[in-house]
Design a protein with these regions (language model features):
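N-terminal pre-catalytic "stem/leader" segment of glycosyltransferase-like enzymes
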Residues: 1-75, 167
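Catalytic core of nucleotide-activated saccharide and alditol-phosphate transferases
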Residues: 29, 50, 66-169
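Donor nucleotide-activated moiety binding/catalytic core segment of transferases
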Residues: 173
Length: 173
């Protein structure tokens, strides 16, 4: 049975670069913070540039000090581009959004780090399938079928070629 004055849950610190709509990995980190807050958790981002689209309060010195004084140990979530533990978190989660080292970082993580992958093809050895957490970074207000079925065009397809355009698309499609 839950106590009336139960212990305050751990907050989440999301180590996220400044928001850019054009960078899907950055967008996903901001979306993660928003999703945690909408699920009733306390979460913050380290970014200075935020999106008005998401609930992403900044992690400030005042917030850090308040949590320290309350004896709270945050859960720190880093994207795969960050090596080490710059926020000195006791509980560290790595969100593998791309192949480690593809964009930045060398993929050096702590042996106690908890690993989650953005998709199945990014699962590293030892990570089970239940550690896939896919947050689609595209804006469904833009990339969706028209509401009016008469305006839908059969056979039209949209592809994302990836950061470096490495995806081969068969022209016959």
């Amino acid at each position: 049975m839950r106590e009336l004055l139960s212990k305050r849950p751990q907050p989440y610190y999301i180590y996220a670069p400044d928001y850019r709509r054009s960078a899907s990995g950055i967008r996903v980190m901001h979306m993660l913070c928003d999703a945690l807050i909408r699920s009733g958790h306390e979460a913050y981002v380290t970014a200075k540039v935020l999106s008005p689209e998401f609930m992403t309060p900044r992690l400030t010195d005042e917030v850090l000090e308040a949590h320290r004084s309350q004896g709270l140990e945050p859960i720190v979530v880093y994207p795969e581009i960050i090596d080490g533990n710059p926020l000195n978190g006791g509980v560290v989660v790595r969100y593998i959004l791309n192949r480690p080292g593809f964009i930045e970082g060398a993929g050096h993580y702590g042996e106690d780090d908890i690993l989650y992958a953005y998709s199945r093809d990014l699962l590293m050895p030892g990570i089970s399938d239940d550690r896939v957490m896919m947050l689609p970074p595209f804006d469904l207000n833009v990339f969706r079928l028209p509401d009016d079925p008469a305006k839908r065009v059969a056979g039209k397809v949209c592809y994302y070629r990836g950061r470096r355009g490495e995806l081969y698309i068969d022209p016959a499609l």
